[in-house]
UniProtKB/Swiss-Prot annotation:
Comp. bias intervals (Basic residues): 244-254
Protein name (database record): Ribosomal RNA small subunit methyltransferase G
Residue span of region Disordered: 1-21, 230-254
Source organism of this protein record: Kineococcus radiotolerans (strain ATCC BAA-149 / DSM 14245 / SRS30216)
Record keywords: Cytoplasm, Methyltransferase, rRNA processing, S-adenosyl-L-methionine, Transferase
Low complexity composition-biased segments: 9-21
C-alpha cells in the first residue's frame, strides 16, 4: 500500500474535495475486474460522491481510489482459495470486501460493520452494483456476531492492530480457515507485538507475511494467520497498571 500502514486517512470536510482529473489504470482494471470493470467504476464513483459526502472516505483519497483502494483491496484475492466464504470485518465503505467481490465472483462475502451510516451505505452500494446474490451486509461489532456468522476467511483492513484483531476475527474463522489482514509496512512489527496473544489463544501456526499485487506501489503486504483445528482460547488481557493493588469492593465501580 502506498503509505504503508493500511489505515485510511482522516475525513476532512467535503468542501475541500480536489477537482483534479482521475487517471484510470485501464489495463490493471481490466485484468483484475474483467467483465465487472464497469461495476468497479460505478463503485469508485459511489465512493467519490456519496462516500465523500457522508464522510466515509476522505476527499484527498478521491484521486487515488483506483490504486490505493479498489485495486489494492482486490489483490487480496491472490491469497484466498477458490469458492471460499468470506467475512469482511469492519468493512467501512466496503473495503476490502466490495472490490474483492467484484474481482472474485466465486467468493461469497458478508460485510460486517457496526456503524449505521456505513451499514446503510453498504446496503445501498451492493444493491446498486447488483451484488445482492454474492454479498450480504450485517450490522454489528465482531464481538456481537460471534456464534452467529463464521467463514473460511475473515478479511480486515485498518480495523485494529493484530493484537486486538486476533481476538475479534479468529473466533469468526472456521477451523482450518484463515484471517487475512492488509497491514502494509507495519506487518512485521504488529506480528511481533501480538505473538503472546496468539499463543494464549492456542494458535500454533506462525503468521505468514505475503505480498499481493504488482510491485508498482498498488500492491500491499498481507498477514495471513491459520486458525488451525484445535479449540480457540480467550486471550488474557494484560492487567491495567495498578490493578493488582486495588482492594476488592473498594473503588472498583465502572
Ligand atoms: C478505519 S475504518 C476502516 C474501514 C475499511 N476496512 C477500510 O479499510 O476503509 C475501521 C472500521 O472498523 C469498524 N470497527 C471498529 N470496531 C469494530 C469492531 N469491534 N467490530 C467490527 N468492526 C469494527 C469501524 O466502524 C470502521 O468502519
Amino acid at each position: 500500500m502506498p503509505e504503508g500502514d493500511g489505515v485510511p486517512r482522516e475525513t476532512p470536510s467535503p468542501s475541500v474535495v480536489p477537482e483534479s482529473p482521475v487517471e484510470v489504470p485501464v489495463e490493471a482494471v481490466a485484468r483484475v475486474f474483467g467483465d465487472r470493470a464497469d461495476r468497479a467504476a460505478t463503485y469508485r464513483e459511489l465512493l467519490a460522491t456519496a462516500g465523500v459526502e457522508r464522510g466515509l472516505i476522505g476527499p484527498r483519497e478521491v484521486p487515488r481510489l483506483w490504486d490505493r483502494h479498489l485495486l489494492n483491496c482486490a489483490y487480496l484475492g491472490e491469497v484466498i482459495d477458490q469458492g471460499s466464504s468470506v467475512i469482511d470485518l469492519g468493512s467501512g465503505a466496503g473495503l476490502p470486501g466490495i472490490p474483492l467481490a467484484l474481482a472474485r465472483p466465486d467468493l461469497q462475502i458478508r460485510l460486517v460493520e457496526p456503524l449505521e451510516r456505513r451499514y446503510t451505505f453498504l446496503r445501498e452500494a451492493i444493491t446498486e452494483l447488483g451484488l445482492r446474490d454474492q454479498v450480504a451486509v450485517a450490522r454489528g461489532r465482531a464481538e456481537d456476531v460471534r456464534g452467529e456468522f463464521s467463514a473460511s476467511v475473515v478479511t480486515a483492513r485498518a480495523v485494529a492492530p493484530l493484537k486486538t484483531l486476533y481476538g475479534w476475527a479468529l473466533p469468526l474463522v472456521v477451523t482450518g480457515g484463515h484471517l487475512v489482514a492488509i497491514k502494509g509496512r507495519s506487518a512485521s512489527d504488529e506480528i511481533a507485538a501480538a505473538g503472546e496473544t496468539l499463543r494464549q489463544m492456542g494458535v500454533t501456526a506462525a503468521p505468514e507475511v505475503l505480498s499481493v499485487g504488482p510491485d508498482d506501489g498498488t500492491g500491499t503486504t498481507v498477514v495471513r494467520v491459520a486458525r488451525g483445528h484445535g479449540p480457540l482460547r480467550a486471550a488474557t488481557a494484560p492487567a491495567p497498571p495498578g490493578a493488582a493493588k486495588r482492594r476488592p469492593g473498594k473503588g472498583n465501580r465502572r
